[in-house]
Amino acid sequence: MNDVSSAPSESLTEYFPEDLLHVVRENQPLRETLWLGIGGPARFLAEPVEIDQIEKLYTAAREKQLALRVLGQGSNVLVREAGFDGLVIKLSAPATSGLEIQGQKLVAGAGAKLTHAVIKTVGEGLGGLEHLVGIPGSIGAAVVGNVSAEGRDIGSVVESIEIIDEEGKRKTLTGDEAGFAHRQSTLMGTVVLSVTFNLEPKDVSALTKRMQKLWIHRGQRRPSESNRIAMPFIDPDSISACELINSTGLAGIREGDVSLDSAAPHYLIAHENATSDQCVKLIGRVREQVLMQTGIDLQLNLQIW
């Protein structure tokens, strides 16, 4: 984000100290940064260029009782039409999205793309993340949600996580302290700054072949008719969300201008003129029907702001 050239509004100066005004803007649209491409604006949107600024933003939000959210790649976020009445911190600057190899470890900024991290580590002959290639989202979101694929979750290779905790204190947690479980962790409510992964040296050629095979497979399953997509549900322990939705006859179900893909129903598609309200209604209908027919309570992968 470029510095704001005009004088800051009274609202900005009321909520944020002077040394943050150049990284915060008011009433900013979010839809351009979200995969679904719908929803209203953020009351305040900040794009910090230094880690210290994130700490100061967090402190300002706490002091002014502003709701706060962190935005990475926007692949699992749905914003309602009314927008988000609070502060959104977008992690897009190099200081928050870098990738650095240190021996057999990867130090990744929370805003870095997960797939970029996979490609970098595979190229360095380091195994442990290659099975996650093609999964959308940022490192921070992937770790908070303990994303998994091929029977292995990302938490299994996390050595440490640098965070700002719920009290605004910067600290480093071990992987064990993050409370990793099936598609969850105890990191929700914190701001993840960076993650260190402990990986295993492996043959570059073998890793590359495995990564390419998985990438092609996932690309073939992704809906081709639309780029405005999201995966709204977490796979239950015993069955994938795709299989579960197919088994209940809900593939292709539609609510206004929003639908589940007919071939890969774990994908939600926002067609032209789609709204966030339609997304919420469709998700609710699917969860209700799946619960009635199978007894399984589908949990949300999508964050609704």
Curated annotation (Swiss-Prot):
The active site is at R183. Its main location: cytoplasm. One of its GO terms (molecular function) is flavin adenine dinucleotide binding. Pathway: Cell wall biogenesis; peptidoglycan biosynthesis. Its cofactor is FAD. It is an enzyme of class 1 (oxidoreductase). Keywords: Cell cycle, Cell division, Cell shape, Cell wall biogenesis/degradation, Cytoplasm, FAD, Flavoprotein, NADP, Oxidoreductase, Peptidoglycan synthesis. GO terms for cellular component: cytosol. One of its GO terms (biological process) is cell wall organization. It comes from the Bacteria. The keyword Cell cycle applies. It is found in: Cytoplasm. Its EC number is 1.3.1.98. It catalyses: UDP-N-acetyl-alpha-D-muramate + NADP(+) = UDP-N-acetyl-3-O-(1-carboxyvinyl)-alpha-D-glucosamine + NADPH + H(+). The keyword Ribosomal protein does not apply. InterPro entries: FAD-bd_PCMH, FAD-bd_PCMH-like_sf, FAD-bd_PCMH_sub1, FAD-bd_PCMH_sub2, MurB, MurB_C, MurB_C_sf, Oxid_FAD_bind_N. Residues 37-202 form the FAD-binding PCMH-type domain. Cell wall formation. Belongs to the MurB family. This is UDP-N-acetylenolpyruvoylglucosamine reductase. It comes from Rhodopirellula baltica (strain DSM 10527 / NCIMB 13988 / SH1). The gene is murB.
